[in-house]
Amino acid sequence: MSEFDGPIEEFPLVSVDRFDKENLNSTVYLLSHCHADHMVGLDALAFAERLKYKSLKLYCHRVSVALLKSLPLYNHLYPYLVPLDTDTPVTINVANEDGSVCYLMELTLIASGHCPGSVMFLLTSLNSSVLFTGDFRFDVGQAGRLKALQNFSKDAQLQIDNVYVDTTFCKESAEVIPKREDCLEVIFDAVKRWIEPAKDRKNVLFVNKTRYGYEFLMKALAEKFNCKIHVSDQQYSLYKYLPSIQQFMTLEADSTKIHFCKFKPGADNNLQIPCQHSLGFYPDVLKIIPTAMFFTKAESSPNSLVKAVIEKTIRCCYSTHSSTHEVVDLLSSINFKKLTPFVRPDRETSIDSVRSLLFEKLKAYKPELVQTENNKPSENIKEGLWSKPLSFKRTGRGCKRRLSSEKEAKEVEKLQNDEFNKDKNLNAEVERSLETEVERSPVDLSMAL
């Protein structure tokens, strides 16, 4: 569960994944993905009015735009959404409250592997750089191959000032979580053993509480067993602007043996499956709970990927968040100055202890890395090329520049003049194409996941 407050310290007037309280003073908003803990305040009237009356924008991946457009709670935000693609840097004018340009920011989206549309944000300016991971799941070695982070790789000269990192499973008991591919094989085997006798009454129900996020699993099941996956009406309508996802789903309960449909509030407790009345018979149902949290607890067996709960109900290991080792692998592949975890793996663990754990693990990769009281690198770490001071100072609800030299001031002024019209044209073009892009262009699911 994300505990991030929203403002990016190094980039004044920019807020990520939080849209209430002090974030209503920002002028640039970023959404990493459409899970509730990253959308606090997004449905509030105050935020909608902020966007409308100040002509502000919310930037996110185009898959997230399609999802927000399909949700009644958020579709009123559609005119203010700017759809972006991964690995395509865009320049954004970060404005003061009065609309004047405060500074220029380059934004790059990086696919994060958590769910459809989920991305990391790489923010850079003349003097600052930040990586906000959002929720992510990377394999070991994957981070080192990311084009967007090459300038900050361990062999490069530049450093990221702050890494805001997903630490959902950063604890000793979650040092390693099996790859999704390995977990899929276990799930495939469980499903096959249950439905292969080809008895009509045999059905499998996957139990999960999230609105979305298991599309990769559903797609894999559909391809493996050459069938569509039954979902509820509400789930199906969520993907009406994403045909590449909707194509492996069905509303016909009796046309498949694999179900992701959900029980409605107040449903009959005697039902074995939400769609039981539509099946026309009393089904024999195996319930599968895809989960990682259970398998990271001390009492679970580290060598088991499946665990029986009660009769005809099993838990299967499946994670959409990175393990401790995978998080450390990401951090070890880049140069950074400061580390800001934004998730506590459990109630007993503090953010400070999570940070300490990661620094301890990182010493194996970077012996020179020393955690100081201020979470800054030790003196023997080389400074990045962007280490020259160019600070921002808030004045009322805006900010002003303090430039380290007259030459730098002129350089910034020239950049602002050159880029301002370019950025205005970019935003206008994005807005004009938004209506047709989401509806006409099927989303490549492999890219989004």
Predicted regions and their residues:
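Cap/insert and terminal regions of metallo-dependent hydrolase folds
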Residues: V140-Y239, E299-K376, I381
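Conserved beta-strand scaffold positions in the cores of enzyme catalytic domains, especially
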Residues: S15, L81-P83, I229, V285-K287, ...
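Conserved G/P- and acidic residue-centered "switch" motifs that form tight phosphate/ATP-binding loops
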Residues: H33
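Short, surface-exposed beta-edge/turn micro-motifs
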Residues: L13, K202, P283-V285
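C-terminal regulatory/interaction regions
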Residues: Y239, P243-L449
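His/Asp/Glu-rich metal-coordinating catalytic cores
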Residues: M1-L24, V28, D37-D200, N208-R211
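Residue-level signal for threonine
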Residues: H61, S232, T291
